[in-house]
Amino acid sequence: MAEHKNITDPNIHEPKGVATATSGTTYVANGSGSGTWGVSPVNLTGLVIERLVDGFSTATSQEPTGLDTTLQIEFGAGETSAPVTLDATGKVTINVTGTYRVKLGFAVGRIGSAGVASIYIRALIDGVQVGQSVHWTIGSAESYIPFTDEAWLTLTAGTEITYEIIKDSGNSGVDAGGLFQSNPTTAGWATNPSASIRVERFV
């Protein structure tokens, strides 16, 4: 009998368990001399993205009241799913531990007044800032700057996520600016909200 190492195709036998393995799966060693068939970490076949909440503000604007005063950003009336809750204040609460994708949209701008506005937005988890602040300096009296962002986050049940905006007085920043809704006059086109959020996960 030939040694196994010397056997060539088509006489080489298939991997252990392949006859009953599901299509698209791979054999992964368990470190104890055996293994199991499952979905490969780089093979997303069979996975779909589940949309959990999809909120947007209906406010004409979201502007902090004065310089250096924080305003929590809201995303509409709120929505609830089993894994995630979005309330009317803009707070996202994680109900089920897992990995989530958070997608954001903000319409930053200003209306009227002279001088340069200095606008910052930040994210907070359980009341503590995470990541860096995002900054805009807006010198025109009529300006609109769209901003989008997304992140995958592994979060435990009970975690609360919020977003804040501020008109900063640093560098002679003026009391102007915030988030603004815009409405197309062309029939059939939807409003662009001042702020929107979507939370998703793989299932």
Q: What positions do the PLM features span?
A:
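Extracellular repetitive beta-rich solenoid segments
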Residues: A2-V42, G115, D168-N171, R201-V203
